[in-house]
């Protein structure tokens, strides 16, 4: 004979399990897809919402539609299915494409369904998280006022430039700038106007460098230009002439207030003057102070 109470309890547990499974499948945050031959044979509503498809329209489609381009689709297939074939899970954070063409970041987690020739994939939109990470990284490595690279990012760029220099037998120039005439402007017109002068100066520096060079603000009214792959020191002189001419252009602060600044500059070359970022910055800083003293003597005369 059957125990009716046990049978009822078993049915209740099964019903609860079905509800839990359905809740998981209907989860609005995690998209789920069953894929065979890279065609979606089943999906939950969340997957269509994540990728912007109308309800019921994603099933039966080739997954290629969800990738940035065909090359990305093929590369993912090679990498992911090679891992799945070993019986392991495959997980990656990657850029994918919504039906509108918008690019989003997706956390992709897949497993092979044994004996079915199918794979099961969980996908979650992590675009907001990625954007937040990028903002945090930007804040950590950029000057808040000018948005130029700060000392930390400059040091990293210098390390990369030194490695390139070693491979290509070229030089790296570190040019250290200190503005002349900034303090009187700051004292007379206030910090807001002083900040505007620094921002304009930063933009002018950035406009004068090549794409593989770096303009950085490392504090106060001090800036650094990192010039990479220098074959002839004359290239540095030519670049500095352009930069100094740009810095010395009048700055219109509005309300009839037009100011000018100039700069003292010191240059150090890798590997001639040092082989580390600390040594090169120190050498360029010392050369800058020598130049600043020379400028001061000229003005007093």
Where are these regions (language model features)?
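Short loop/turn elements at sensory-signaling interfaces that couple input to output
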Residues: 108-120, 272-276
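Catalytic core regions of nucleotide second-messenger enzymes
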Residues: 216-218, 233, 247-264, 273, ...
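Catalytic-core segments of nucleotide cyclases and related cyclic-nucleotide turnover enzymes
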Residues: 191, 240-241, 255-256, 269-300
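Sensory-domain boundary/capping and coupling elements
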Residues: 8-23, 130-142, 148, 152-159
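Per-ARNT-Sim (PAS) sensory domains and their PAS-associated C-terminal
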Residues: 85-106, 117, 257-259
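PAS/PAS-like sensory domain cap-loop motif
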Residues: 47-59, 68-70
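Conserved long alpha-helical elements within nucleotide-processing catalytic cores of c-di-GMP signaling
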Residues: 137-141, 148-173, 180-210, 216-220, ...
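PAS-family sensory domains
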Residues: 1-3, 67, 116-127, 283
């Amino acid at each position: 004979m059957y125990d009716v109470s046990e049978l009822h309890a078993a049915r209740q547990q099964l019903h609860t399990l079905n509800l839990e499974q359905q809740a998981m499948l209907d989860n609005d945050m995690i998209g789920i897809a069953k894929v065979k031959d890279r065609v979606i044979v089943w999906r939950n509503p969340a997957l269509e919402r994540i990728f912007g498809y109308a309800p019921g329209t994603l099933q039966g489609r080739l997954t290629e539609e969800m990738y940035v381009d065909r090359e990305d689709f093929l590369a993912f297939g090679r990498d992911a299915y090679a891992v799945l074939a070993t019986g392991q899970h495959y997980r990656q954070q990657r850029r994918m494409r919504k039906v509108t063409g918008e690019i989003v970041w997706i956390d992709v987690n897949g497993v092979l369904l044994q004996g079915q020739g199918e794979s099961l994939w969980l996908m979650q939109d992590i675009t907001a998280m990625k954007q937040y990470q990028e903002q945090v990284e930007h804040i950590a490595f950029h000057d808040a006022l000018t948005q130029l690279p700060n000392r930390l990012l400059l040091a990293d760029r210098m390390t990369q430039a030194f490695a390139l220099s070693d491979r290509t037998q070229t030089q790296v120039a570190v040019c250290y700038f200190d503005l002349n005439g900034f303090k009187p402007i700051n004292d007379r017109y206030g910090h807001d106007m002083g900040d505007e002068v620094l921002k304009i100066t930063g933009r002018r520096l950035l406009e004068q460098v090549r794409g593989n060079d770096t303009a950085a603000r490392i504090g106060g009214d001090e800036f650094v230009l990192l010039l990479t792959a220098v074959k002839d020191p004359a290239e540095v002189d030519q670049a500095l002439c352009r930069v100094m001419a740009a810095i010395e252009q009048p700055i219109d602060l509005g309300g009839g207030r037009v100011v000018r600044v100039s700069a003292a500059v010191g240059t150090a070359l890798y590997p001639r003057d040092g082989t580390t970022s600390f040594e090169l910055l120190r050498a360029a800083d010392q050369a800058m102070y020598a130049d600043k003293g020379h400028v001061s003597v000229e003005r007093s005369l």
